Regions:
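Surface-exposed beta-loop-beta
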Residues: 18, 44-47
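Conserved active-site and cofactor/substrate-binding residues in soluble primary-metabolism enzymes
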Residues: 2, 25, 32, 61
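A general boundary/transition motif marking the beginning of the first structured unit of a protein
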Residues: 18, 22-25, 85, 134
Length: 182
């Protein structure tokens, strides 16, 4: 969320996005917490005869993968020298995705919105300077990383059984039942 805010305001710097920044420290703390949760999930799996002991282990593995992508996103943000016009739209989608990071979420809507943004960027005029080209390339790479972030969640959701969805998610919060389950 902090990265999206900095990008929107055009005030992202090495201090706000790079190593040692508050966002970086929060991501490191999150990663440490997820590692602890994953260890507990493995312990739970290994000590229970429950019908779905893998759920928590798979969930925290997915979140750790997403955490690695957050690290990469922060590094990319630190490479921006100037903020192209497209930075505003990238900040908006980052903020939008941040609002929807929750356990019971199927990311189809976020992937669709990201796809529309990528199409819009393809239609924008070509950069006129090398610096603009490089900064737009960084933004594009950020969007590719964001797509991977969402695809990790999508894969997790697709691998859930109906029983796991019912047990851990209760009544599914899905926009389209058919898109959720094959």
């Amino acid at each position: 969320r902090q990265i999206a805010d900095g990008l929107q305001k055009g005030r992202l710097s090495k201090q706000s996005a790079g190593k040692g920044s508050r966002a970086w420290e929060e991501t490191a703390a999150l990663e440490e917490h997820l590692q602890s949760c994953l260890a507990k999930a493995y312990e739970y799996r290994d000590n229970h005869f429950a019908t779905h002991p893998e759920y928590y282990a798979c969930y925290f593995e997915m979140r750790l993968g997403q955490c690695e992508i957050l690290d990469s996103l922060q590094e990319e943000m630190g490479r921006l020298r100037r903020f192209p016009v497209q930075a505003e739209a990238v900040a908006e989608i980052l903020a939008y995705v941040a609002e929807h990071v929750m356990e019971r979420n199927e990311p189809a809507a976020q992937l669709e919105r990201l796809g529309r943004l990528l199409e819009d960027m393809k239609r924008s005029p070509l950069p006129v300077s090398r610096e603009e080209f490089e900064n737009r390339a960084v933004l594009y790479h950020i969007l590719m990383e964001l797509e991977e972030f969402l695809k990790l969640k999508k894969k997790f959701v697709e691998l859930l059984t109906e029983e796991q969805v019912e047990r851990y998610w209760g009544k599914p919060e899905r926009q389209d039942e058919k898109s959720f389950r094959k």
